[in-house]
């Protein structure tokens, strides 16, 4: 235990003592549960539930529940939770973040807190970054839960609402952050409560929590419908930008911002034949020019995006993966399409949106696990109220982290990287090289090809076999080049992964992909008849697995002798956490390994945020292209630059959250109103209250200093909802405002009661629900757009010495108030004027069930959009108005 003393500060050590006492209790229970028969062990779930029903808390039964899970895992998986894995489980149960190094078995760690919290019957969500991991983790860990009588579901792309509801109704559900978030939005667009699939947000464990809650924090999930704006301005702006020279615009690389200079503005005014392009009347044109500028000056092909099959596909800056189905917002995507000469797609209209920050903060309890979180603890505490506990490793970490090598230029740096690869390759040491972009990975690949080094390249262009390539990166002599953290979630096992090798061999032997994917899942209860091929494949799998297991164990010894996995970073990322993730691929479970970063002074981080002192040192030394430099000041400057960027990015995310919180509060109010309507609450009193309020406001409006404007008031009420000639009140001019309000309200209620008698009581209540839902949805969609436009222009308030956030809150509140007024007026107007000839049906503003999800992955600087709704521009609007969509909700 002495090495732990060096790893943890006093606070951590104090807490670790407490955790160890709890784990001692869990360990002491092991003999008791070991001696139980399977049936007795299975019955523990019923016993625990009974104890909870009798007043005990889940904290009370934690030691026993954890001990039960450990014993079941031994029996069904052959895996026994280490003490440190039990500590990790306790941290997760407490609603905190467990930082556990790569290879420490985070998937298994989650099983104990998942089971414990699932005993409440309120559901547990396990969140992963992609469908592959969600399904893999569900299939592997379901054996434990199902043994204990728990149902386990998985939410993946493409499932229909019926299947999704079944998965959410399980005790435990695995899925991706995107699928959970989009289902939440869709549940708040349905028009019957039975169409909702989620059953509440109780407890979530987020795997790779830093990726989801930090890297993707600013990513809004958006469900959208087709817009109505023309695309010609994108082409015009693109053609104009091609005429500009560098002096016509100013680039702020640090902030990734670009704007026209005075000469650029003058050229734009001449080109588009306008007097003052910055005038409010030319806002849209100026916006298109700015987006075209961004597309040409800031957005780089094969770094930020790729052009594939006639479309622009975003590249995730953190993983290097292609983000199919994702589009940049605010016209940037269209500007890039124009730049690349592709067909320009129309901008869409937002129907519903939420950020990951606000979605995950809705869970009653939230926890997470990752290999790298401590550097972002301040942000986790500030935004999510979660602290980070560094769980000790099961075995002592012996990886050698070598000092950075700094070179004057990129050419010198990459030549040095290639030379180190050659030297390590001579002894067959496996090497994983991390690059920051597709462009850089292909540059290094070309250098290695010229030097005759066989290697694998894993980037957004070659992502098909990502998991397999990463899993085999620990084989003898393997050289793998990967962009950033591609393959995250897949362990690199020294000597190779026998499971992947077995499945590859089976594919070569002619087994179909669907069969290969099922060979290692439970087959208990599956009849032999009709599944002969599966049983044959299972036998083949077990035979081949043993063969490859022996082979990889032999190879592992050779890899260890060669020094383990060598990690080479070709550039420092702007976040220390991303660098630590790359380092963390080596040295798992006490394996040997090494890591080193190579840095060029012209790397983005050094060029934009590095200290001027570095340039001074280099100039004094007279550094050659291929001469490395090591200096204490350099190391401090690099770390200082990273801290500077991390602080800046945290500030941006915090600032964005201030704005998003305004919209979030409004969303909560609207969704709560929808929920009330959906769940069948009698709206009669609310409709009466709305009617009274409208009349009262109108009376106030037409009662001024000169007295009551009777004619103006009547005309206003007839235009709103009352039949012409219905307001006949003797000597109305002698009544005070309160009396007028009550008299007109009596008239309105008689008319409404008469309509209700014609329609029938129950039917009228359903009509009220239908009308109110449609009014809420239609106005909410327009309000989202209006708030978005307000937010885009609010920054200018700073010029007038007004805090933009405060201005946004105040004006947003006024707009929300105005929206509620319109909802009220529309609801009452439609109800008083509706003629019911056919049975009333609830119709959604958009066909939620037919929305298709994009594939996994998101990008923080883009809006994540669900596309391919079935509502066309010229289709009848689904709200039931009888108008075309483009002239109604699609306006």
Curated annotation (Swiss-Prot):
Instruction: Write down any Gene Ontology CC term.
Output: cell envelope Sec protein transport complex
Gene name, please? secA1
Q: How does it assemble?
A: Monomer and homodimer. Part of the essential Sec protein translocation apparatus which comprises SecA, SecYEG and auxiliary proteins SecDF. Other proteins may also be involved.
Q: Which amino acid positions bind ATP, per UniProt?
A: 85, 103-107, 491
The species this protein was found in:
Clostridioides difficile (strain 630)
Cite the cofactor comment.
May bind 1 zinc ion per subunit.
- In which broad location class does this protein mainly occur, judging by the first location in its UniProt entry? membrane
**Assigned EC number:** 7.4.2.8
Q: What class of enzyme is it?
A: translocase
Q: Which CDD domains match?
A: DEXDc_SecA (cd17928), SF2_C_secA (cd18803)
Its name, as the record gives it, is: Protein translocase subunit SecA 1
Q: Which PANTHER family does UniProt cross-reference here?
A: CHLOROPLAST PROTEIN-TRANSPORTING ATPASE, SECA INNER MEMBRANE COMPONENT OF SEC PROTEIN SECRETION SYSTEM
Which positions are annotated as binding Zn(2+)? Answer: 877, 879, 888-889
**Where is this protein localized, as stated in its record?**
Cell membrane; Cytoplasm
Q: What does this protein do?
A: Part of the Sec protein translocase complex. Interacts with the SecYEG preprotein conducting channel. Has a central role in coupling the hydrolysis of ATP to the transfer of proteins into and across the cell membrane, serving as an ATP-driven molecular motor driving the stepwise translocation of polypeptide chains across the membrane.
